Amino acid sequence: MLALKAAYRLVPGDGGEATHRCELLPDDGAGRLLLRDAFEGEANASSVRAESDLAPFKPRCDVLVRATAWAPGEEPAERWTARLRVTGRGAPPPGGDAGGGEPPRRALVDKTLEVCGPRWFERAAEGWQLTRPEPAASVPVRWERAFGGRSLVRAAPGRAPLLDEVCFTNPVGCGWMEARTLDALRDAGAPAPDRVAAPQIERPDSRVTRLAVASHPPHAVEAPQMAEIAADYPFAPAGLGCVGRAWTPRLQRAGTYGEAWVAGRHPFLPDDFSFAYWNAAPDDQQIPHPDVGLRVELWNLARPGLACDGRVAFELPPHRAFAMAWIAGLPVPVPAALDTLSVDAESMVVTCVWRALVARALGVRRMEARFEVDPRAPLLKMAVGRG
């Protein structure tokens, strides 16, 4: 396996559908392969900022967005929407005549998030009441602002917590509570909270209307049971960034590591391992490995001063990454698939990761990473000597 990475700066475009264009950045760090996961805050206890680029294979292309949702015009509002759309070039009409224009584009991702200002679940005699959102000009699109959470009740120093349960679909979010939390707080002699944070990032089909109180078993559960329990959660988290490796449904794709695996497969992957585990994007942000002509559009996901009426749109350049594999003494170009497209709308930087796979049985003695910016150039260029 060979992985290549390139970074582009989004700069204002020259008109047309695209508001911005991609300008290739020099190798100043942004385009270097990431060797370990990077987090927004505490490692393994906050949103993943960017995942390691060392995945062996991704069956689909991850489309990931790191952004802040901005209210239109940067005017504080209680609610607004943000949107991500990714399209590819459509097939030409029969006969090849598109009327002099571009064929209709194919929608690969079209995702809308509902955003609101800070709000809370406040404890009252009749139960937890959801407050009206406070006006806000911006909200970071992080899993901490989406449905999920952790119920942690600490005991005396040096002792195990009285309770430590997480929402299996998003352990770092808010709006979720394990049913034993208030009892555990009372046993610990700790005060119960008067209010808890409510989600600010929602899916249109899963609006959070109440505090989700879930009952987990008092013992540890395996991945299949986690999925069954999570299926009963009343709401689903919403976001645009990496899904944690240990979250449902991604965890279940890692396979089963039981006694049968220890006896028959260890140290290799279990028989039910799915390479889809290596895809980090939410399922609705995974697309087939794209060809040239990919267009990305963002609405209300970039600072208004950098957007055009709240919209940022750009097309990926037709650059090609590939590996030159030397087989039996001859160079053989091996195309690399684009499997990770990351848009950081806060820094206006786009990164792409391509991955090339070559079978070990071919006896490759050497592989070289190559990057071609001329879409018309052949991948293999033969020098002609003059006698």
Predicted regions and their residues:
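Extended intrinsically disordered or low-complexity segments
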Residues: 1-387
